[in-house]
């Protein structure tokens, strides 16, 4: 499968621990250059900051939700094309992406627009199954009127929801938590 454009996303957490347990968690997203003849993908911001966590307040057996973060995804193509994409990353459980050994994140595409008009997203091999969540191994295609639609510009808000296990927060030394992957535009046929 030919990759039209690639967007690399790295979810990286850096924890600094002292007498009061705290962690600064940051997500980094950046784009990889592509040739002029290909579609171009960009994100609105390269860094998503999860702020400071206090492990003593958050630790336990339950997963800790680190919040929702949103960035804007834009695809610009020189010619009208069917937009289909996936996110390639390490699967945590088939439905979420791994974030280190003890965390995970979900990606949801919200408010998708093709050439400025609202569209739907569906599984590439089953257009009847509408979806806005990008799960491991899944490819979504842009639909208008129930069929794959062609356009030159696509945009959507990418919501990143991240969780970390309570046990992972309750550590006493510097800890690095990493996870990531990349968006790919793929042929829709």
Where are the regions a protein language model picked out?
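Mature extracellular/passenger domains of Gram-negative fimbrial/pilin and adhesin proteins
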Residues: 2-6, 11, 35-189
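Residue-identity detector for glycine
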Residues: 13-15, 20
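N-terminal signal peptide c-region/cleavage motif recognized by signal peptidases
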Residues: 31-33
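Bacterial N-terminal signal peptides
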Residues: 20-29
């Amino acid at each position: 499968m030919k990759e039209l454009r690639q967007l690399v996303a790295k979810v990286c957490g850096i924890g600094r621990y002292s007498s009061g347990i705290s962690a600064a968690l940051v997500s980094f997203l950046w784009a990889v250059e592509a040739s002029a003849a290909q579609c171009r993908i960009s994100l609105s911001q390269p860094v998503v900051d999860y702020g400071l966590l206090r492990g003593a307040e958050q630790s336990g057996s339950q997963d800790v939700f680190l919040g929702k973060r949103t960035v804007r995804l834009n695809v610009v193509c020189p010619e009208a094309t069917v937009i289909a994409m996936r996110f390639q990353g390490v699967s945590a459980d088939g439905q979420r992406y791994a974030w280190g050994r003890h965390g995970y994140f979900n990606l949801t595409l919200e408010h998708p627009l093709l050439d400025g008009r609202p569209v739907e997203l569906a599984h590439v091999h089953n257009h009847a199954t509408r979806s806005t969540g990008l799960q491991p191994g899944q490819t979504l295609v842009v639909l208008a009127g129930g069929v794959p639609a062609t356009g030159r510009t696509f945009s959507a808000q990418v919501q990143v929801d991240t969780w970390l296990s309570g046990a992972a927060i309750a550590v006493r030394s510097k800890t690095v938590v990493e996870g990531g992957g990349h968006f790919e535009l793929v042929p829709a046929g």
